[in-house]
Design a protein with these regions (language model features):
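N-terminal Rossmann-like NAD(P)+-binding domain of SDR-like oxidoreductases, especially those catalyzing
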Residues: 1-128
Length: 128
């Protein structure tokens, strides 16, 4: 039975609010996958239905290998989101936003998992 959702970037503002919403509205188990580059432990929600994993989305297939058959959907918010900092840390931005997102899409396609994706303001540049 698919009773698990994954929220990448689950320790950021949007991800943690989504987790809170799912806890109130569903009975699903939740995994937050976050590298804590901008997310924070302060956004953790103490609930036995939530598991927090520190990892980069680039490694999603390895990190979720044993759980993949239970995953109903992945909500992908785990990206390098700061516009100014994305230009200062271009390699980290490319790894997270391009390669990490590619890994998430590939994992979802290979395992027939629904993907809900939300880009960040960094993907639009300064004029976005």
């Amino acid at each position: 039975m698919k009773n698990l959702i994954v929220v990448t970037g689950g320790c950021g503002f949007v991800g943690s609010n989504l987790i809170e919403h799912f806890l109130k509205k569903t009975k699903l188990q939740i995994i937050s996958l976050d590298n804590y580059s901008s997310g924070t432990i302060k956004n953790h929600i103490k609930n036995k239905r939530v598991t927090y994993l520190k990892a980069n989305t680039i490694n999603i297939s390895k990190v979720l290998k044993k759980r993949k058959r239970y995953i109903q959907a992945i909500f992908h918010f785990g990206e390098f989101a700061r516009i100014y900092q994305s230009f200062l840390n271009m390699n980290e931005c490319i790894e997270s936003n391009s390669m990490g997102t590619h890994a998430v899409i590939k994992f979802c396609m290979e395992n027939k998992i629904k993907l809900i994706y939300s880009a960040t303001s960094a993907s639009l540049g300064n004029k976005g």
